[in-house]
């Protein structure tokens, strides 16, 4: 079952206390989004990093409490966000499991790491939500998919939606096995989009356009096309047909794409990436 949520769905997190373990790229993006959208008071926000210098930098930049000790940081917090790499997850969970409680919500961004794995590592009935954002979150245009663990209640999901709604759109799924497909499609998807942008740009350059102009035309065209799909709700095939006139320029270009096997290549990319995600998942 899919619960469709958008970033305009919001409840107040003002009185909640939030700790972000790992203020790296995505962790800092979340922190920035939370602050800009006034979701949580600054005095109720905290972040941790492995290096003292980086902790001081974050403190100075955002005016929040920063730590290098995760155990100290999570005390009294309502929401704990694990914005760390999967190879670090076991060590971090082992460090905090003795002091974490079932009243705290854990949100994990660690790729290929199931809610069950986190629950087992913590050795308690802890509410855990798995989140898969993507890199456009860095400019608040992300796509995040959430999947709740077995101890999650509706209010936990609503809080997670608010947090990730600060950096883009949010969807919720309840079948965790689909997170491997999510990883392959929206998690890895920006890389596929970039190679398409790069290739179309090269095509424009080959035919005489200045490189920067070709890149801008390509990026804006794909951005606009994506927004049309989202805003109109129309099937991409219908939108494609609206651009394709009989005996026109577009149909010849489409024929070359079909001849090159673009559909099959993209479908196979998702299939292979999904299998890879399954291979490394735990």
Where do the PLM segments sit?
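NAD(P)+-binding Rossmann beta1-loop-alpha1 motif at the extreme N-terminus of oxidoreductases
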Residues: 7-75, 142, 205-206
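A short glycine-threonine-serine/GTX helix/turn-capping micro-motif
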Residues: 180-191, 240
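Internal alpha-helical scaffold of NAD(P)-dependent oxidoreductase catalytic cores
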Residues: 117-127, 143-181, 194-231
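NAD(P)-dependent Rossmann-like dehydrogenase/reductase catalytic/cofactor-binding core
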Residues: 6-8, 12, 219-282
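Rossmann-like NAD(P)(H) cofactor-binding subdomain of soluble oxidoreductases
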Residues: 52-53, 61-62, 70-146, 150
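Small-residue helix-packing motif on alpha-helices
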Residues: 45, 55, 73, 210-217, ...
């Amino acid at each position: 079952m899919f619960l469709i949520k958008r970033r305009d769905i919001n409840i107040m997190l003002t009185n909640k206390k939030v700790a972000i373990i790992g203020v790296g790229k995505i962790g800092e993006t979340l922190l920035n989004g939370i602050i800009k959208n006034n979701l949580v008071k600054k005095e109720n926000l905290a972040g941790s990093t492995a290096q003292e210098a980086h902790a001081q930098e974050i403190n100075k930049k955002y005016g929040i409490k920063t730590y290098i000790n995760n155990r100290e940081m999570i005390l009294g917090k309502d929401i704990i966000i694990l914005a760390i790499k999967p190879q670090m997850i076991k060590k971090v969970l082992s460090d905090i499991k003795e002091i974490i409680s079932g009243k705290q919500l854990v949100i994990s961004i660690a790729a290929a790491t199931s809610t069950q794995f986190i629950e087992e590592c913590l050795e308690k009935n802890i509410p855990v939500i798995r989140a898969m954002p993507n890199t456009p979150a860095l400019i608040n245009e992300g796509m995040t998919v959430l999947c709740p663990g077995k101890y999650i209640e509706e209010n936990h999901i609503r809080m997670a939606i608010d947090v990730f709604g600060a950096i883009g759109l949010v969807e919720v799924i309840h079948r965790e096995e689909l997170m491997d497909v999510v990883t392959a499609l929206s998690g890895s998807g920006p890389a596929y989009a970039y190679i398409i942008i790069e290739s179309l740009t090269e095509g424009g350059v080959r035919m005489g356009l200045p490189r920067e102009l070709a890149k801008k035309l390509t990026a804006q065209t794909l951005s606009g096309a994506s927004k049309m799909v989202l805003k109109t709700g129309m099937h991409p095939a219908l939108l494609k047909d609206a651009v394709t006139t009989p005996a026109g320029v577009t149909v010849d270009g489409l024929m070359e794409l079909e001849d090159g096997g673009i559909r099959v290549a993209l479908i196979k990319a998702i299939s292979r990436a999904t299998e890879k995600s399954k291979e490394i998942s735990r």
